[in-house]
Each structure stands twice: as C-alpha cells, then as structure tokens.
C-alpha cells in the first residue's frame, strides 16, 4: 500500500510525539527530499506573473462598465441626505420635484428608491449651496485665494497601509465635495490600480516633471557658464523632451468625477538612479523643490483643493520630493512593536535627511547673505492602522 505525503508526515509527527522529542529530530532527509517539488527556474517567475496578471484582470473587470472602465457605485437618497448633503429626506424630494432640471436619479421600480451618481450628487450639492438655507454649509470649507493643501503619506516600512490610507482619505475628501488630485510616487503603482489609471511608461508619471525642473535649472546655469566663457552642460534628448511636458499632459481622470490622478508604473523607479546623476552634474540644483515648483508653475495647486501623495516604502529621492512638497505628513503604522520601532527609525532618518539638506544649503546661504532654508509641515500625525480595539 502506497502511503501519501500527508500520511508520512503524520507518522513522523506521531513517532516524534511518542519519543518525547521535537518533530525535527525525526526528519528523514530522503523523505523530505521526496516531499519537495521540482526546482524552480527563472522562467517559472514569468509564468507566475502571467497567472497573477490574469487573476488581476478578472478581479478588476468586475468593477468595470461596458466600456472597460472602472465605475463608481450609485448613492441612495438616504445616503445622500444622511452623509453627503445636510437636508431632510422629505425636503430633498420636494426640491427635486420642484426643479425637474435637477438630476432625478434612477429607480428600478415605479415609485421605488432613487439612486444617484456622485456627479449628480455634486450638482445637487451646488444647487443647495446656491438656493438652500444660508445657515447650512453645503460645500466643504475652502479658503479663497490659497493653493491646494498637499498631504504626503509616508513610512519606509512596507505593509503599514500607506496606499490604503491615502486612497480612503482621497475618496472621503471627494465625497465631501473637494477637488482631489492623487499623485502616485510608488513604482509599484498600487494607487494607480485602485483608481484605474493607465500608465504606459515613465513619461506618464511624475518623471518628466522632475526632468523638466532639472532641464530648466540647467538652461539658467548654462547661460551663466556662457557669460563666464565656460562650456555649457549639454541637454540630452531626455531633458529636451521633458521641457515639452506639463502636468496637464500627465493628469488623467478617474471613475470618481472629482478625483484626478498622476499615475505610476515600474519604470518610475528609474528616477531613483537618474536624479543623483543630475545632482552630481549640477550641485546647485535643488532637487527637493522639483515637484512643488512644477505643480505651482503649471497651475495645478490652484485647480485642486487637496493633493494626496502616495510614497514608496523607502526614503529615496521620490519620497524626499513628496515630503518636501507636502503641507501635512501622515505616517501610518500597524499596532505592533516591530512597526512602532521601525517608525521611530523612520523619524530619525527624516531628521537626518532634511537636517543635512538644511545644513548644506544654509552654509552657502549665510555666506551669500540669503534667507536660510527651513523645512516645515503644518501637521505631522502618526496613523495607527490594522488595529481593532475589540
């Protein structure tokens, strides 16, 4: 009678238990070898990746419409009046009846519950803000004349919920009526996947904005070099192409009517190698200002209310750009000792990194009589994730 692998393992476990010794004292090397599968070669990785791709496509397609795009669910009258627009349900229905030009919602049955898209909810909110009670705030708070607030979600430990936190906050802000831009700085592209972004290569990520910032600096530097009779630093084809790209070329809409996206994909990681090369060529280039300056120059911060930056699990050049650009820093961490310990080390590295930038810049600033550099954030908060008090 041929014994199965399970029966063999059970017998070995029983033998170890009867002898009073740990199970590993009774491992039979030959039997263990027979339990192993065939060796895995590199080609197997491609097969696994292909299988994962098919599974991902299947799962993602379940939330798509007939055109293959992600679609956002509808909102009921009860949800709208309970959470989104501060009006009583009977009054809400009376307003719709009195204003047939307003979105009337969809109903599966005659006289049944009405369901609305988020775009329709935003139109209804605008109507109530204009025609409704002046004692109520229908639109979200937004000081006039100020740029968008930028929120970075960062921690160099992976798996703490950075992307989930940023995505949920972006969606919550959108439900409140804010105009939201999400910038994915993580080459894994998880945030991009959440919002159904399509990113073919690094030229549809933030990379060309960083390259354009460097190219513009190099142009100014080269003019000074020419004035001094020195040879200019050449602009290669990459930098020349980057000068043609604006943020508007990179921003794509999502299935949320008031959330836009600058996505990411694997080639974005190339920035982590290219940025230090540029910095070595031009030591005066302030790489940490690249993202902020380009977003400001392209009017992005005036077109949105809140910008969320999802950073990679590392304190590299992309993360430094995101942190330097942000007004608010959120640091997610799980409720465990290891994650608490790692987060403490993250703050230590934040201090070392930004302090070294300040020290290097301010030495030159003091010598030239210029204002000193000081990084500041309006708020820094640790966000405990994956915790249930029960």
Region annotations inferred by a language model:
Residues 2-83, 89-90, 94, 101-390:
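P-loop NTP-binding core
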